[in-house]
């Protein structure tokens, strides 16, 4: 995905409501398969890009693209609001504390600038919007760069390890597709 100072927003459900420390993981390498596998990318390097600013919000219970949330926390990277990202780089954000009440979503927002930024076709996985700075505000976008993992520091009863990813599950390998391939094998 190429972006010239584009601000993206995506709403994510949280596993547990309340105040927690969150961290966000990023990979600037693409491993992806689409459709029947004839279109796939293995170890494809992302481009150089800049994270100009990132913020998380209590996203509320509604998906209003142009809402101005009141509860927010700035996301930083090694103490800085901005980050230059190199091809194939992997990194975590610093921890950020946010209170997301029961039934609310975590709203991820960031402004990025650069070329070949790894992005995902979100379709019906989450509400995703982009503001290109053209005065039109946030408009729906199907292809959006987002963190690869949202981590939450909370007490757990047990740890579970899973193997596989969206491809092995057949999730979003075609538009609105959920084939659950692992269950079919």
Show which residues each predicted segment covers:
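N-terminal secretory targeting modules
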Residues: 1-163, 168-175
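Phosphate-binding active sites in nucleotide-utilizing proteins
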Residues: 158, 176-185
